[in-house]
Regions:
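Short, small/acidic-rich helices and loops at N termini and domain boundaries
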Residues: 1, 64-68
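Short, hydrophobic/aromatic alpha-helical segments in well-folded domains
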Residues: 46, 65, 140-143
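Non-catalytic accessory segments of DNA primases and related replication-initiation nucleases
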Residues: 1-52
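A conserved helix-loop-beta module that forms one wall/lid of the active-site cleft
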Residues: 55-61
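Phosphate-handling DNA/RNA-contact segment within nucleic-acid enzymes
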Residues: 72-170
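Short helix-to-loop capping/linker segments positioned immediately adjacent to catalytic or ligand/cofactor-binding
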Residues: 37-38, 70-73
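Serine endopeptidase catalytic core focused on the charge-relay Asp
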Residues: 50, 54-55, 85-86
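N-terminal structured subdomain of primase-like DNA metabolism proteins
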Residues: 1-5, 59, 135, 148
Length: 170
């Protein structure tokens, strides 16, 4: 009948939901593999990158370094800082691709990428007693932990403005 909306086909809905679930599981496996392949950040070009940006605080174990992280847009492996995103139902990471000497971000597009669904999660860069401070980016959060905040605080990076809006607070 003309003008009446057609109800969605239950089989098509089920197919799309199964596809979305399979994709989420695949991305979670990829994120977990990326995290496991990465090494502690100390004495790596990821630490060099952060120190060159004036970050002086102790670097958290939520940050690691991957010497050959996959960059899908260019189909090649590039050094990257890998950050674990917590507070989510599935495992996810954020990658910042770096120049080989750690002097800055890699000259790639994009030079930052998320793997897995990150909305609602955050990277804890400092877990001290005190207020919760939420920043958009990892470097901003680390800068706050490097002395811009005058008292102890828990500092999170929500990764984007929409990430801040979706953040699940304790």
């Amino acid at each position: 009948i003309e003008g009446k909306p057609v109800p969605p086909d239950p089989a098509e809905i089920a197919r799309r939901e199964a596809e979305a679930c399979a994709d989420a599981e695949k991305r979670e496996r990829q994120a977990l593999a990326c995290w496991r392949e990465a090494q502690p950040i100390g004495s790596t070009i990821a630490e060099t990158y952060l120190r060159n940006r004036g970050i002086t605080c102790e670097l958290p174990d939520t940050l690691r370094f991957h010497p050959e992280c996959w960059h899908g847009a260019t189909a090649r492996r590039v050094p990257a800082m890998v950050a674990r995103v917590d507070g989510l139902p599935r495992f996810a990471v954020h990658r910042t691709y770096l120049r080989p000497d750690g002097s800055g971000k890699a000259d790639l597009t994009p030079n930052k990428a998320m793997l897995g669904r990150t909305a609602g999660g955050a990277i804890c860069v400092c877990d001290e007693p005190g207020p919760l401070v939420v920043a958009e980016g990892i470097e901003t959060a680390l800068s706050l932990s490097s002395g811009l905040i005058r008292r102890p605080a828990t500092v999170w990076a929500a990764l984007s403005a929409p990430g801040i809006a979706a953040l699940q607070l304790p």
